[in-house]
Amino acid sequence: MGIKFLEVIKPFCAVLPEIQKPERKIQFREKVLWTAITLFIFLVCCQIPLFGIMSSDSADPFYWMRVILASNRGTLMELGISPIVTSGLIMQLLAGAKIIGVGDTPKDRALFNGAQKLFGMIITIGQAIVYVMTGMYGDPSEMGAGICLLIIIQLFVAGLIVLLLDELLQKGYGLGSGISLFIATNICETIVWKAFSPTTVNTGRGTEFEGAIIALFHLLATRTDKVRALREGFYRQNLPNLMNLIATVFVFAVVIYFQGFRVDLPIKSARYRGQYNTYPIKLFYTSNIPIILQSALVSNLYVISQMLSTRFSGNFLVNLLGTWSDATSGGPARAYPVAGLCYYLSPPESFGSVLDDPVHAGIYIVFMLGSCAFFSKTWIEVSGSSAKDVAKQLKEQQMVMRGHRETSMVHELNRYIPTAAAFGGLCIGGLSVMADFLGAIGSGTGILLAVTIIYQYFEIFVKEQSEVGSMGALLF
């Protein structure tokens, strides 16, 4: 059934826009250039407003997810990477549940990737329609069918651009992946902005600067009670404070520390005697994939809940899924869940919120740990990184594990890889929860994604450096 499904969509995959694989080895300088161009296009799209929208000042239901999904409200990047990640989530779940089968052949892998792209385009259209019809840009009946269609087309084209930019990097023209690059850029931009933003916000305490560091100096300069000003700079509510910055730096350090945890399996050449090496199995074996998929799951649940809440407010089942409220203090207008399933799957705002509602905190912890472990373990089966796949790669390189026969390699690798994947996903979820409870800027999930992505790029640079010889040779 699985292979038949991939064969059915094969004609559709053939007409999809595609980036061709490079016919030659791309030099590092070219990769840096293409990566910079990709990032520039993304940042430009983040600043171009959608043409035809009547208003985008209403409460933002996806405010808490925008940092993670690399989206910017009211612009071409309204959807961000959500369609790509959602299609990946759907395909992974279908493959993990054996509803569709993905073979080990390059043909099946290519069809699987094509199906993922096709679903990404379909989801882009679906999300664009939902955004327009739920009134995020104004009343659809007042805007008219033509303007609504124009906004949907803009969102679809922007989503297609994101798909192709991601594919451009993944095909080897650039460094890393587009998804990772866009997420890391968005999160780092948010952290810097929350620290140094010169924007003023009118609070009950008077006019204050949004940036935590600028606000501290402003408070010390304008308040007569310096001790109180210092305390307010560290602990002020509803706006970024220095404790949030300290928590962010602390989480960065902890995640970097855990990045170094790994088990080195001794391997040797089956052809040449005396040639030994190691195969590293990292604690974060699936890197940030679990948290990205978990974010996609929650964001789509938010979309569905918001859509139903707008249309069928007061319905018991709709309220069971999520009840929403608007908040305008301490920043832009935003909607947040106050009851229902969406509330319990959203992170507590601070450690004080954990003490106020321990049931919420407990359910959130269980959900984060369980979903990250599940996604991590199922991802290895569809991404070519399971014990069977690793054993096949080692066999192709004519390498075997020391002290084990070639036929027993899969069994031995199965002792480590699934455990590392599940436990690594569990740790990823745990670190994200810790960051949320400490109040880190950009959310626990965002900080975790930023650190793991930056670390991935550091490893890419080190690898390229070892291949070329020196960083100077890489860049000049």
UniProtKB/Swiss-Prot annotation:
Keywords: Developmental protein, Endoplasmic reticulum, Membrane, Protein transport, Translocation, Transmembrane, Transmembrane helix, Transport. It is a multi-pass membrane protein. GO terms for cellular component: endoplasmic reticulum membrane. Component of SEC61 channel-forming translocon complex that mediates transport of signal peptide-containing precursor polypeptides across the endoplasmic reticulum (ER). Forms a ribosome receptor and a gated pore in the ER membrane, both functions required for cotranslational translocation of nascent polypeptides. May cooperate with auxiliary protein SEC62, SEC63 and HSPA5/BiP to enable post-translational transport of small presecretory proteins. The SEC61 channel-forming translocon complex consists of channel-forming core components SEC61A1, SEC61B and SEC61G and different auxiliary components such as SEC62 and SEC63. The SEC61 channel associates with the multi-pass translocon (MPT) complex. PANTHER family: SECY/SEC61-ALPHA FAMILY MEMBER (PTHR10906). This is Protein transport protein Sec61 subunit alpha. It comes from Hemitripterus americanus (Sea raven).
